């Protein structure tokens, strides 16, 4: 449970002990966030999503930073292209990520002197099992009209593949990206332009 700081610290310590340290943290944790317009979101759902996303990220980074300072490591956060161009009905996904983006900039600025780099990847629509499940549910956000309208916004005229995201994360975590910090890299097929 990423909302429990004791549990997160224990897991981080166990991983560091097993592998002799930690040099990269990739935060790709997430859950099925409902697509809702702002006016339709009740406060309990809002608080639950913010707690899981923002506080979960904070707990992970707070427990991992000492290890990253030792290894001069890297943080890679999986974010959303909705940061660049807001998709209506996606505030529950985008709002916490906007907060986390600023926390990453803070880490990049404050811990750069310790060799820690902090970056994110802003995902567009990625062709995954979750995406197909949402389409099959045939809700109003993922119907054929939505599919066509999104496809029309993409410069590459296709959805992304998981390996394209993974390759970007591996690059950002590697020494090849050793002079990149505080940035959000779009992997969105040109959605943001």
Specify the residue positions occupied by each region the protein language model found.
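The beta1-alpha1 cofactor-binding region of Rossmann-like NAD(H)/NADP(H)-dependent oxidoreductases
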Residues: 1-10, 43, 163-164
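Substrate-binding pocket helix/loop in short-chain dehydrogenase/reductase
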Residues: 36-38, 45-48, 150
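C-terminal substrate-recognition "lid" of short-chain dehydrogenase/reductases
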Residues: 67, 158-187, 192
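Catalytic loop of short-chain dehydrogenase/reductase
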Residues: 74-100, 104-113, 125-126, 152
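Short, flexible catalytic-loop segment of classical short-chain dehydrogenase/reductase
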Residues: 101, 123-137
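Short, small/polar-rich loop/turn modules that mediate ligand/substrate recognition or access, typified
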Residues: 112, 117, 180-182
């Amino acid at each position: 449970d990423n909302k429990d700081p004791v549990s997160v610290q224990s897991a981080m310590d166990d991983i560091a002990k097993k592998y002799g340290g930690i040099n990269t943290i990739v935060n790709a944790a997430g859950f099925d966030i409902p697509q809702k317009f702002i006016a339709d979101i009740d406060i309990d759902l809002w608080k639950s999503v913010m707690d899981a996303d923002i506080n979960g990220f904070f707990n992970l980074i707070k427990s991992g930073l000492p290890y990253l300072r030792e290894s001069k490591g890297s943080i890679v956060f999986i974010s959303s292209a909705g940061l660049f161009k807001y998709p209506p009905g996606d505030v529950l996904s985008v709002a916490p990520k906007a907060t986390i983006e600023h926390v990453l900039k803070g880490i990049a600025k404050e811990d750069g002197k310790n060799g820690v780099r902090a970056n994110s990847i802003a995902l567009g629509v990625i062709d995954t099992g979750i995406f197909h499940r949402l389409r099959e549910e045939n809700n109003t956000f993922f119907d054929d009209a939505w599919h066509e309208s999104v496809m029309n916004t993409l410069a590459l005229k296709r959805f992304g593949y998981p390996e394209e995201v993974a390759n970007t994360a591996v690059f950002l975590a590697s020494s090849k990206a050793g002079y990149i910090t505080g940035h959000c890299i779009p992997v969105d097929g040109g959605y943001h332009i």
